[in-house]
Amino acid sequence: MKTPHKKATARQQTREIVDDHTLSASMRKKKISQKKQRGRPSSQTRRNIVGCRISHGWKEGDEPITQWKGTVLDQVPINPSLYLVKYDGIDCVYGLELHRDKRILKLKILPDKVPFSRVRDVHLANTIIGKAVEHMFEGEHGSKDGWRGMVLAQAPIMKAWFYITYEKDPVLYMYQLLDDYKEGDLHIMPESSKSSPKEREPEGVIDGLIGKHVEYTKEDGSKRTGKVIHQVKAKPSVYFIKFDDDFHIYVYDLVKKS
């Protein structure tokens, strides 16, 4: 895993996958594949690590081993081997099969506790969730750069943090957004008069996308595959997608109107 630079610098390195590419609208039904036939390690004897602090090495190809520490935020229900992890000093959330990924070396459960945190301003927290925002970051020369995005949810375990994604970089990030709001670095965008809650698609249809495989067509015509792993409660048309060849969690609106 390469360490992305924090704040505005990270966003200047926008991933190739988000550069004017189109997410294929076609959804393929989950197939009974070889993955389903593989023997799975027994989860009954394995400790629940959600909420735990972890450390491990990371070895990819010929690159030197790097050491990582972080907090396990969640276990994905449709793929219990997949965990969402917030690593120390990293702003984005990673999705990794901690017990299966061969690049992960010497996984350890650390004795240190996750610091207890709670939201002091519940009203403000409820106000920003689901809202379009402009998030200000300090640029290279001290200038302020605004990044438009959406606040998705309060993060699990680390309750003072919030999930957020950006138009220019649609992967899952998490920040202490209430602090940013009070410091004037997070602005709620005015809602469009054209939008209406009544325009949402039927929830039953939307729920049916969870667990489905998706195909992503890049600008050069090449494709990558992944799976829809989560639906955003505050914005039911928005989903988390985990691609097979990437440990980032991507965030897309899968039922946008043409």
From Swiss-Prot:
Residues 138, 246-248 are annotated as: Histone H3K4me3 and H3R8me2a binding. It is found in: Nucleus. Residues 13-22 have a biased composition (Basic and acidic residues). Residues 50-99 are annotated as: Tudor-like domain 1. Residues 1-47 are annotated as: Disordered. It comes from the Eukaryota. The keyword Isomerase does not apply. GO terms for biological process: gamete generation; regulation of DNA-templated transcription. The record marks 169, 176, 180 as: Histone H3K4me3 and H3R8me2a binding. Pfam families: Spin-Ssty. Keywords: Cell cycle, Nucleus. Residues 210-255 are annotated as: Tudor-like domain 3. One of its GO terms (molecular function) is methylated histone binding. Residues 27-39 have a biased composition (Basic residues). Residues 129-178 are annotated as: Tudor-like domain 2. Its main location: nucleus. One of its GO terms (cellular component) is cytosol. Belongs to the SPIN/STSY family. May be involved in the regulation of cell cycle progression. Exhibits H3K4me3-binding activity. Interacts with C11orf84/SPINDOC. This is Spindlin-2. The lineage of its organism: Eukaryota, Metazoa, Chordata, Craniata, Vertebrata. The gene is SPIN2.
